[in-house]
Amino acid sequence: MDWKNVYREKLTTAAEAVRRIKSGDRVVVGHASGSPEVLLGAIMDNCDAYSGVEIVHMVAMGPSEYCKGENARHFLHNSLFAGATSRESINDGRAVFTPCHFSQIPRLFSEKILP
C-alpha cells in the first residue's frame, strides 16, 4: 500500500480524535510550545463525556482549563512541573505533582513509575 494512502486513512479532526478517549484514560501531552492546544480545546469541548481522565504534562503554556475547579470531576491533572497554570490546582489538592527532570520522563513510562 502506498504511504500516502495510509496517511490519508489516518487523518482525522481533533473532535473525532478526542472521542476515542474514555473515562479513566491517561492522556500525556507535550509541554510548553509543543502543547497540542487544538486537541486540549477539543477535550474541553467534550468534557461532559469524561470522568477521571488523567492529563499529564510538564509546563502548560495555554489556558489549562482542565485544571480549574469546575472540571475536577472530569480530569485529574498530573503535573511534572509546577508552573503558573497548574500551581493553584496542586495547592488545592485537585492535581497531582510528580516532580521529575525532563531527562527522566521516558523512565516514568518505560519503568512503569506511572503505570
Language model features: what each stretch is:
Residues 1-115:
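Conserved alpha/beta enzyme-core scaffold
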